[in-house]
């Protein structure tokens, strides 16, 4: 529903229909798109570690700070991945273990949706298996590509 509301806002503010706003011409710039893949079990382990780190580094305190500054749970920013679960923990609706479990589950669902959304057969995406490539190597690929543009 947020996307529909935003689309309507744009149409009203520009006076153009959505189809009129879509450009049909090819952009006058080149695009390099990376697709990063990883064994699902490795990715899930990294997700688990990241969630634990976020809590260890003050995620709960961050949310309390946002609430103190006037943020409310009906704001779009407070519906970002994990924030509703942190909110439920803060409101004593469930314990920390359950909050982490739910955030892990939601994160895994997002991974599955992203793997479905981005096709491995899409030739406009340069796919890299992260088990065999470091971020430094990816950076080198990007720099080489940029340097090859006339």
Which residues does each PLM region occupy?
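Phosphate/Mg2+-binding loops and adjacent switch elements
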Residues: 1-31
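Catalytic core of IPPT-family isopentenyl/dimethylallyl transferases
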Residues: 27-150
């Amino acid at each position: 529903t947020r996307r529909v509301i935003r689309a309507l806002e744009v149409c009203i503010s520009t006076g153009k229909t959505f189809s009129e706003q879509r450009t049909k011409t090819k952009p006058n710039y080149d695009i390099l798109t990376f697709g990063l893949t990883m064994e699902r079990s490795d990715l899930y382990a990294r997700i688990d570690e990241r969630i634990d780190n976020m809590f260890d580094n003050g995620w709960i305190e961050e949310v309390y700070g946002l609430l103190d500054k006037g943020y409310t749970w009906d704001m779009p920013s407070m519906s970002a991945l994990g924030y509703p679960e942190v909110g439920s923990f803060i409101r004593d609706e469930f314990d920390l273990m359950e909050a982490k479990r739910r955030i892990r589950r939601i994160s895994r669902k997002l991974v599955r949706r992203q793997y479905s959304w981005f096709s491995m057969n899409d030739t406009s995406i340069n796919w890299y298996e992260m088990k065999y490539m470091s971020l430094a190597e990816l950076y080198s690929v990007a720099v080489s590509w940029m340097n090859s543009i006339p």
